[in-house]
């Protein structure tokens, strides 16, 4: 029985074959929709080739698989140009819808890329949702984020960040705007005003030194010329004039107190200023050269010298007419002061 059931109920293979055709009908000009005419035929005992009945029966029982074919023929009834125009409109509408969908999906991406790529990004600067630009920096020592404030533009916030970075991390810090070496040197260079003040102070000290040295020279010249004016010695005047002119060329200005330079000017006069021979030497113009020895030597008062000597004091040429007391009294009058002038 089981064998018979298997032979009666074999397996079935179903296939469908479809064909599409279009035809133009003039009667459908008023309608804008296309009509479809579908024709279908099913062959339950389909074979690949034709044969006798016996062979078919034999194959039906012998074959393990049954084959069924379905043929479908679809005919599209169109109304010519109207139908084609409507189809073109439908296709154009579909294309427009597709284009709108593609634009709606692509446009936000494009706008986002333009906003992000069009604007320049700065270090330590971020934009708030309401449009302001915030600047902040991290302190490497405290390990804390420092708030620098909000600004209207990104450039202002970037400049504030650069200043804070230079203060915290030095001139080698990473900044948004590159710093040229000229500006760096200008920032590091000291201000010129203190130098000018120092120069002015040095000039003032030099002027004070030269003034003090000139005053000291004038006072020294006055002190040196006072005995010459009293004794009326031309040799002494020439000597002191040469001395007063020579130290002027030898003065060296130094940035030291004025007392040191004054002491240096007086260092040339370490030797005694006046000797007995220079002060009381009357060989220049007053006393003739034939005295030969010292002014107050032993040969001064010899008999030969006294006979021929005459000083212009109307004493006479002889030794008897020369009174020693009267002569020295006149010398004392030279060093004294007139009583009338003193009053």
Curated annotation (Swiss-Prot):
Gene Ontology CC, one term: nucleus
Subcellular location, principal: cytoplasm
Residue span of region Disordered: 40-60, 180-223
Signal sequence segment: none
Family: Belongs to the AP2/ERF transcription factor family. ERF subfamily.
The keyword Transmembrane appears for this protein: no
Function per UniProt: Component of the cytokinin signaling pathway involved in cotyledons, leaves, and embryos development. Probably acts as a transcriptional activator. Binds to the GCC-box pathogenesis-related promoter element. May be involved in the regulation of gene expression by stress factors and by components of stress signal transduction pathways.
Biological processes, Gene Ontology terms: cotyledon development; cytokinin-activated signaling pathway; ethylene-activated signaling pathway; root development
Residue spans binding DNA: 121-178
Induction context: By cytokinins.
Biased composition (Basic residues): 195-207
UniProt-recorded Gene Ontology molecular function terms: DNA-binding transcription factor activity; identical protein binding; transcription cis-regulatory region binding
Keywords: Activator, Cytokinin signaling pathway, Cytoplasm, DNA-binding, Ethylene signaling pathway, Nucleus, Transcription, Transcription regulation
Intracellular or extracellular location(s): Cytoplasm; Nucleus
Listed name of the protein: Ethylene-responsive transcription factor CRF2
Gene3D superfamilies attached to this UniProt entry: AP2/ERF domain
Segments of skewed composition (Low complexity): 208-220
């Amino acid at each position: 029985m089981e064998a018979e059931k298997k032979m009666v109920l074999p397996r079935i293979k179903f296939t469908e074959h479809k064909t599409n055709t279009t035809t133009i009908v003039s009667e459908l000009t008023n309608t804008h929709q296309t009509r479809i005419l579908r024709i279908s035929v099913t062959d339950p005992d389909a074979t690949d080739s034709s044969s006798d009945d016996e062979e078919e029966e034999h194959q039906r029982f012998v074959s393990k698989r049954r084959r069924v074919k379905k043929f479908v023929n679809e005919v599209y009834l169109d109304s010519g140009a109207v139908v084609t125009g409507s189809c073109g409109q439908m296709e154009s509408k579909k294309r427009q819808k597709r284009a709108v969908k593609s634009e709606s999906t692509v446009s936000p991406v494009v706008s986002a890329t333009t906003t992000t790529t069009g604007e320049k990004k700065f270090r330590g600067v971020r934009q708030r949702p309401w449009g302001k630009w915030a600047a902040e920096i991290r302190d490497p020592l405290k390990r804390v984020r420092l708030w620098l404030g909000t600004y209207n533009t990104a450039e202002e916030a970037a400049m504030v960040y650069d200043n804070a970075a230079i203060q915290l991390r030095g001139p080698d810090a990473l900044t948004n705007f590159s710093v040229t070496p000229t500006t760096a040197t200008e920032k590091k260079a000291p201000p010129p005003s203190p130098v000018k003040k120092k120069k002015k102070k040095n000039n003032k000290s030099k002027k004070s030194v030269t003034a003090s040295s000139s005053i000291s020279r004038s006072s020294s010249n006055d002190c040196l010329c006072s005995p010459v004016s009293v004794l009326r010695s031309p040799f002494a005047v020439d000597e002191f004039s040469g001395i007063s002119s020579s130290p002027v060329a030898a003065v060296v200005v130094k940035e030291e107190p004025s007392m040191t330079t004054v002491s240096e000017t007086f260092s040339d006069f370490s030797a005694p200023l006046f000797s007995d021979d220079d002060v009381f030497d009357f060989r220049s113009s007053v006393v003739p050269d034939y005295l030969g020895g010292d002014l107050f030597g032993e040969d001064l008062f010899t008999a030969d010298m006294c006979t021929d000597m005459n000083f212009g004091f109307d004493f006479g040429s002889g030794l008897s007419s020369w009174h020693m007391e009267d002569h020295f009294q006149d010398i004392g009058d030279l060093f004294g002061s007139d009583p009338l002038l003193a009053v």
